[in-house]
Every structure is written in C-alpha cells, then in structure tokens.
Amino acid sequence: MHESSRLPVGIIGASGYGGVQLVRLLQDHPQLEVAYLGGDRSAGKEFAELYPHLGPHLNLTIEAIDVDRIAERCAAVFLSLPNGLAYDLAPALLERGCKVLDLSADYRFHDLKTYALWYGGDRQDAAVAHTAIYGLPELYRNRIANAQLIGCPGCYPTASLLALAPALKQGLIDPDTIVIDAKSGTSGAGRQAKTNALLAEAGNSVGAYGVARHRHTPEIEQICSDLSGHEVLLQFTPHLMPMVRGIHATIYAKLRDPNLTTEDCLTVYQAFYRNAPMVKVLTHGTYPQTKWAAGTNLCYLGLEVDARTGRIVLLSAIDNLIKGQAGQAIQCLNLMQGWEEGLGLPTLCYYP
C-alpha cells in the first residue's frame, strides 16, 4: 500500500472513456490517489501515450491485470470493463480486502437469471453477486455506505430512475403506464469504432436503436419494481444524438390522481431530494438541458402535469460519462469511506 495519506485506488480498464473519465476526476479528489492502471490490449503503454492531455498529471504505465499486485497497492478498485468481465475479477479482489466498484452491468441485478437473459454468460459467483449494492446514492445511500461491492448503474437508468423515483415512491403514478423516451451522445457507445457513431453517420441525424430490446430496460424495471412494491414492465426507447456527451430523458406516466397539479408534484420532488446535493429540481416552467449537466456530476430534473391527458411529463438531463458513469462511482466510494458524497466531484458545467 502507498504511504500517502490519500486512499490508493486502481482502475482496471483505464483506456476506455469510463476509465479516462475516472482518471481525470480523481486528479481533483483530495482524498483519493490513482496507484494502479490496468488493461489488456493497452498493457505496457504509458497512459500519456494514449491520452497526452492527461500525461503531465499522471505518470503511470498501464499494467497487465494481476489481482495480487492490485490488492497490494490498492484499497479500492474501479472496474471499467465491458460486460461479462468484472465477475471474473471482483470475487478475487474482494477476497483480498479491496472494495470494488463495477461500472459494467455485471453486479446490477438481484436475479442473475435476468442478467443471463439479457447479457448471457455462465455465472459462478452468485454468493458474491448477492452482496452487491446498486450504486444509485440518491436511493440507496445507507446501503452503499456499508457495502464492499457496488454495481454502478447504467447511464440511461440513472437519468430515468432519478426522474421516476419520487413519483413511484410516493404513489403519484400508475407504474404500468411508464414510457421513457431517452437520448444519448455518441460517447455512450464507448471508444471502439462503430459505424453508427462515426461523424458522417451520427452528425445531423437522430435515430432510435435497441427498440423494445435495449439492455437497460430490465435494470430500470428492477428498481421501479422495488420502489413501487410490485413488478413493473415499461416501455424504453433510446436514441442516438449528434453530440458527444449527455443524456436527456422524457418520461410519461398516468397520474393516479388526475387533480394533482404541477406545483403539487414539484413539492413532492423538492422534498424527496432535499438532502441530495447532486440532484437539482428545477422551478416550474424550466426544463433540463444536457449542456447544463456537461462536465458535472449533477442531474437536472423538471416536470409538468398535463391536466388534459391526466399524465405527468418528467424530464432529466445528466452527463452520461460523469453522473451516468465515473462520477457516480466516485460518489459511491465517497459514501463507502464516510466522506461527504460530493467530495471532489464537479458541479459547474462547461458553458457555452
């Protein structure tokens, strides 16, 4: 372990967008220090070779993944890997005393049968998976504080669930009427080359993908079911937008009481998130924009009641790489360490 007073952490999967976002954010964290960067195809390369703009701040080489070496040097480890790889590493790291924060889908599900149905894979880690806590601090703050293994939420689920949670928890809506229309920037597809994320394909164009089969659907349904107290099936459709970062979700649901007003619902939301420093509930008539959240760990929420249709319209905006990924993972580690949850996390956007 490091002799530094700061907590040494490692990042496995340091060369992807999630990994580099973690590296950048951790440079500004007063209590955390990057002690290890791990990778597979990038092993042996200087981090500065991959990301020259961060080179002056982090003089580390990406190393081959060695669990014993990681445990010797790190108290906590972020797994920023493709789905299906974390569950081979997390049990060994936990056994060696490391706290583990997994940014993939591997530890997000209560039921591994649901995971297998949507993601595949032969899981042999059911006992370990049972100990994982879903890493959405605004809903599970106390559980996260006492956890050793965190399954960090996906980006679409983060934006969707923060918008839906108060309405579900307080019984404002009929859960079976939920429709989620969400948009994401191209960085959500990762750093590997994909045709639909090329500038010539994504520029000046908007299109849906994963219609009726996107993998984030069961994740959103799982937490909505927990919040409402019964099984929820909902409609979720994501779209790719011609921008680099950001997620915007517009969500529709039928109100149980058609006499509720926008002001009534805003009062519920403001009370629900009164102790949530990373969630900003906007005033009536102001609706979230992705630009406001860019570069921050904030989620902006707005809402409107449509008295004509008896529906509520919920709107949210986050930075998919920060509140939707790396920043939220750090927020969870802050809680696990007993620190203020927003410690070291940005709250001012890039503007314009």
Curated annotation (Swiss-Prot):
Per its record, the protein catalyses: N-acetyl-L-glutamate 5-semialdehyde + phosphate + NADP(+) = N-acetyl-L-glutamyl 5-phosphate + NADPH + H(+)
Enumerate the subcellular locations listed in this protein's record, separating them with semicolons: Cytoplasm
Q: Which GO terms describe its cellular component?
A: cytoplasm
Which InterPro entries does the UniProt record give? AGPR_AS, AGPR_type-1, NAD(P)-bd_dom_sf, NAGSA_dehydrogenase, Semialdehyde_DH_NAD-bd
Gene Ontology terms describing biological process: L-arginine biosynthetic process
What pathway is this protein said to act in by its record?
Amino-acid biosynthesis; L-arginine biosynthesis; N(2)-acetyl-L-ornithine from L-glutamate: step 3/4
EC assignment: 1.2.1.38
The entry's family comment says: Belongs to the NAGSA dehydrogenase family. Type 1 subfamily.
Q: State which residue ranges cross the membrane.
A: none
Q: Which NCBIfam families match?
A: argC
PROSITE patterns per UniProt: ARGC (PS01224)
Per the entry, what this protein does is: Catalyzes the NADPH-dependent reduction of N-acetyl-5-glutamyl phosphate to yield N-acetyl-L-glutamate 5-semialdehyde.
**Active-site residues, Swiss-Prot/TrEMBL:** 155
- Per the record, the domain of life is Bacteria
The protein here is known as: N-acetyl-gamma-glutamyl-phosphate reductase
Keyword terms of this UniProt record: Amino-acid biosynthesis, Arginine biosynthesis, Cytoplasm, NADP, Oxidoreductase
Any Pfam family the entry gives: Semialdhyde_dh
The secretion signal range is: none
A single Gene Ontology MF term assigned here is: NADP+ binding
